[in-house]
Amino acid sequence: MGTLRFFEEVVSFKIRRTFGFADYKRHLPPYAGGGVFLTFTKRVRNAPNEIQMKKLHHIVLVLALAATLFTGCTKDEGVTPRPPVPETADQTIMFYLTGTNLGSYFRKNVDDAMNAIDRNILHNSRVLVFIQPQRGLSMVLELYYTPRNDDYVPGAQFSYEHCKVDTLRRWADADFNSMDGGTITEVISYMAEQAPARRYGLILGGHGLGWVPDGTSVNAIRFSAFQDFWSPMPNALPTRWMGDSGKRAEIPQLAAAFGNTGLHFDYLLFDACFMSSIEALYDLRGCADHIIASPCEVMAAGFNYTDILPHLLADAGTSYDLPGVCSEYHDYYMNRATTKSGCIALTVTGELEPLAAIVKEIETKYPGQTYDRASLQTYEGLDEHVFYDLQGYIEAICDEKDPLLDKFRAQMGKTFPTESRLHTPSFYSVYGLGDAPNGMHTIEDGKYSGVTTSAPCERFAPEWAQTSWYRATH
């Protein structure tokens, strides 16, 4: 065998300690049987000698066999036996993390959630995660708490003293499309069947573009222009819009998929870009009582679940603190994150129809009103903007002395509670980096309402006129 110039194999934590090889890349473990089997991908250049290589091959074979046996375990045969699950949980929180090119960030999200659960915050509630660790493989996991710590590996990712992972279901299908409406319904329904609860919360992580239709639904003549329009600038930092092209669910399809589950969520939390869009929120108003979302891009790291999850499992898991979630998100990006870009808002969906009724009065009274579009706050770096501040737009078209404007502002306070409309002084956008230092765009004082509209946008005017929000307000 001599010197082997390149050797890559899946090895366990113990091999690292035995051989001292460097350059390990952690991968999401193949969760199974109530425990966590930690794996690492290792690259070894110029392996020391044939004897060591034989020893390495021997250990790898043993580990491969162990992994085979491990993934074949029943729940009762896992390394750390599961405690009994409640017949009906106080709350089931579902993570729906879709796509593979945010994989490392999703793995960090899962790790952070485990870190929170390790502190014994679940009580009578449950947390399930849908994730796609690689193309062609999708799975539903459950994160649970146990007093046992049989398989704890100090310092290793996905290994905690008391939070463990169980694989409930796998899909090994290269054609599996997690953003197909039928698939969304199937997966969420499955999670609800496995973890029935008195109330449900849903966290959606992935790529978002607000209400804007998928490029494939724009007519063929405009398709390439649509793609070019949303192309990120060179050297852009990763956000939760970039990637997994061709696999998107438009908002009406998403709302229908949620509705087909028969569930009504207490809250939706969008860990995705541009989802605090009035057009998108209005489509989703029947799916949940509250929606947490950002009007601009969300950095690829997303929400900091180590600190967020305790707010979602308040009062021993029997309730949730959504304003606390917004505050925690804002605090993280304001004070701890490298890129200080964090804008967030909480929507009370039951107040969206009264808001639409007031906006209709204003739009009817001021049809075709001229205004300075350039003076409005926007939430991306595009030369031709798509997402404008909703309150700024209405204030621009409505006379300042009109009582309708006071009525609108009062209703905005009910629909988007002021204490949960939070923002950093500027936001990051992968679009139009040449126009702003380091991709950062300033939010002007007094111009942030936490929700966008595309009413002033001309590029997508025909599509915008087909939205439910347009029909409700015109």
Locations of regions flagged by a protein language model:
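Second-shell loop/turn segments in exported
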Residues: Y96-G103, R170-S178, W241-S245, L268-F270
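N-terminal module-boundary/linker segments of secreted carbohydrate-active enzymes
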Residues: D76-L122
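Terminal, contiguous helix-loop blocks that mediate binding/assembly
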Residues: Q227-H474
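Bacterial Sec-dependent N-terminal signal peptides
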Residues: M53-K55, A67-D90, A455-C457
